[in-house]
C-alpha cells in the first residue's frame, strides 16, 4: 500500500486526478466550504448534473455517494458524498463517515478510474473532530486499498495546516506498519 496514499495541502479543485470527491450536502446543490469551491470551479455543468441526479434519486443521504461529470474541472468525474453532522459521536457518525469514504472508493473503482482526491469530509461546518475524522479516513481507505487494486492512487487534500499535519502524521504511521 505504500505509495498509494498521498497527503497534500492545497486547493482540491487543482489536483491532477481522475476523480475529485466533494463533501456535499444532501441536496447536492452546492454550499459552503469545499462543496462551494468545487461547484464554483466546475461551473454550471456540475450543478446541472447534480440537479439531474437529485431528480432521479432524491437527496443523497449521509454515508452515500453519487458520481457525476466534472464540468470545467480538469478531473474526469466528481463523486459527491455526504458525511455525517457531528452530534457527539452517539448517532452512528463514525460508521457513516467510513461509509462515505468506502462508497466513494467503490464508485471510483466501478467506473475504472485510477486516482482520486478526498477532502477532509465532515470536518468543516459539519463539526466532526478533525483528528477522529482523519483516523477514520485513513483506516477506511487503507483497508479498502489492501483488498482492491483500484484506485491506484488516493490523495488526501488538506486545505488547512491543522488537517495537513494530522494526515501527514497518520501517513507516517501507516508507512511504518509491516506489510504497508
Curated annotation (Swiss-Prot):
Pfam families in alphabetical order: Macro
Class of enzymatic activity (EC top level): hydrolase
Any one GO MF annotation of this record: O-acetyl-ADP-ribose deacetylase activity
Active site: 35 (proton acceptor)
Macro domain segment(s): 1-175
SMART domains registered for this protein in UniProt: A1pp
GO BP: any one term: purine nucleoside metabolic process
The reaction(s) this protein catalyses: 3''-O-acetyl-ADP-D-ribose + H2O = ADP-D-ribose + acetate + H(+); 2''-O-acetyl-ADP-D-ribose + H2O = ADP-D-ribose + acetate + H(+)
Enzyme Commission designation: 3.1.1.106
UniProt binding sites for substrate: 11-12, 25, 33-35, 122-126
Keywords recorded for this protein, A-Z: Hydrolase
Keyword Hydrolase belongs to the record: yes
Role played: Deacetylates O-acetyl-ADP ribose to yield ADP-ribose and free acetate. Down-regulates ribonuclease 3 (RNase III) activity. Acts by interacting directly with the region of the ribonuclease that is required for dimerization/activation.
PANTHER family for this protein: GANGLIOSIDE INDUCED DIFFERENTIATION ASSOCIATED PROTEIN 2-RELATED, MACRO DOMAIN-CONTAINING PROTEIN
Quaternary structure (record): Homodimer. Interacts with RNase III.
Family: Belongs to the MacroD-type family. YmdB subfamily.
Protein name in UniProt: O-acetyl-ADP-ribose deacetylase
Organism: Cronobacter sakazakii (strain ATCC BAA-894)
